[in-house]
Each structure stands twice: as C-alpha cells, then as structure tokens.
C-alpha cells in the first residue's frame, strides 16, 4: 500500500479505559478523544493495538456501559472514510463482532503483516509472545475457549463486569504503578520474540503494545522493535509518515 501525499499512519495502545474506576479514567478518555480529533486531519489509517478498555465483554444483547465519547469519535472517524484497525489485547480479548457491526472496524486476534511505502510491518498486541509467561499462555487458552465465554455469559452483567474490574485493579501493571521497568534486551520477552521472527522473515518495524513501556530498539539490519507505551503514564503514540517511524508523546 502506498500512503497518500501528506498523510500518516498512527498507532496507539493500552489505554485501559475504565481503570482504576470510570471516574478516574474519564480525563484520560477525554485526552484520547482529543488526540483522535487531531490525528484524523492527516490520518491515512489508525491502528489500535489492544487493551483500549480495561475490560470488555460482549453479551448477545449487552456491551459494557460507558466509553460513549471514545466509541462516538471512533465511529465518526470511520464514517469519514478513514480506516481503523483494532487488535485485541489481554483485557479485551473477549471482543467479538460489536466493533465490526456497529463501527465498521475490523478486529484482529492475531498478529498481522503489512507493507506501506515499501516498508514491512508486523503488528499485534504482544501478549503471550516470546519465551516464558507460560502461566498466562495457559490461562489465555482457557479464557478464549468457547466454553469459558459460554459460562461467563450466564453471569449477570452487573456481576461479571464488577468481578473483572476488581481483578484488573489488583494488577499493578494495569493500575499504572511505577514498577514497570526495562529488563534489558536479553530479558524482554517481546524483544526476544521480535528477534526470533526476524530469523525467518525480515520486517522493518515490529510494533506491539502490552508492555506499557515506550521503546524503539534496533533488533536487526534495518529492523526496529517498537513498543507503543500506554495512555496511563506515558500517553505515547506512533506515527509513520511514509519514510520513517517516530514515537511521540501527546
């Protein structure tokens, strides 16, 4: 795909709206909506790399309350003709077809490959990738099974959502505590995953979220691993102008 003149591709991840409470999250939602309003002026397309919400579950006739301004702005941008691509994270992994049917936004549960202006991209949320974290990988298989979703749907939404919110608040990574530190390239699972992917296929940019740490690291010849950070502590986003990728703060 060739990017139109004076257009850019934008990337953002890990907003975790709704955490630690809807009231505390609201200013961050307003800031994100303002960012969307700004970038739509020259956006070729927008990639959202997961955990937009701290919890999301789609019952057959019900979706979680709130996030009206965020959803409305996404709908407005999509209706204007600007493509938006959504990758589920570990907090919104139960996303089904609501975004596709109501917002016309495709939803991806796995990494995707793209080429823009001759540059190759590998894009995804990043959870469960690389060595280690075997407990989470096992848990993800259980949570994403059709049986688990069927069981959860039997919980009344008031109970199911409250339970999920309680568990999320207990996770320090999600609550935004300042204990997320760079572990070194040899210990960062997503960095190791990126390097392993490059052994079989070259990408110029391997872009992920999940880690909550803004990072741009060289992982090979003309290859960069990029972590988009988050909208809890850093308010960072990525932009590709057709020639180079930059990580910026809003």
Where does each model-flagged region fall?
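N-terminal short leaders/motifs
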Residues: 54-77, 176-203
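Active-site-proximal loop/helix segment associated with metal-binding centers of metalloenzymes
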Residues: 126-189
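Core catalytic region of metal-dependent phosphoesterases/phosphodiesterases
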Residues: 2-8, 12, 17-116, 233
């Amino acid at each position: 795909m060739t990017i139109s003149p004076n257009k850019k591709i934008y990337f953002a991840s890990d907003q975790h709206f709704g955490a630690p409470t809807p009231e505390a999250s609201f200013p961050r939602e307003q800031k994100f909506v303002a960012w969307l309003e700004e970038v739509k002026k020259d956006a070729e397309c927008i990639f959202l790399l997961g955990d937009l919400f701290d919890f999301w579950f789609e019952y057959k006739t019900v979706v979680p309350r709130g996030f009206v301004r965020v959803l409305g702005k996404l709908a407005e941008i999509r209706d204007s003709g600007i493509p938006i691509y959504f990758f589920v994270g570990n907090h919104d992994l139960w996303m089904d077809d609501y975004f596709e049917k109501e917002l016309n936004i495709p939803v991806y549960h796995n990494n995707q490959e793209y080429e823009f202006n001759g540059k190759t991209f590998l894009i995804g949320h990043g959870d469960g990738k690389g060595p280690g974290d075997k407990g989470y990988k096992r848990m993800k298989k259980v949570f994403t099974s059709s049986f688990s979703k069927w069981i959860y749907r039997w919980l009344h939404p008031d109970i199911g959502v409250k339970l999920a919110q309680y568990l999320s608040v207990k996770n320090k990574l999600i609550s935004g505590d300042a204990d997320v530190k760079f572990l070194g390239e040899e210990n960062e699972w997503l960095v190791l995953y990126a390097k392993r992917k490059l052994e079989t296929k070259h990408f110029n940019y391997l872009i992920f979220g999940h880690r909550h740490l803004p990072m741009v690291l060289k992982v090979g010849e003309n290859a960069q691993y990029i972590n988009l950070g988050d909208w809890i502590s850093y308010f960072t986003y990525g932009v590709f102008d057709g020639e180079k990728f930059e990580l910026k703060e809003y």
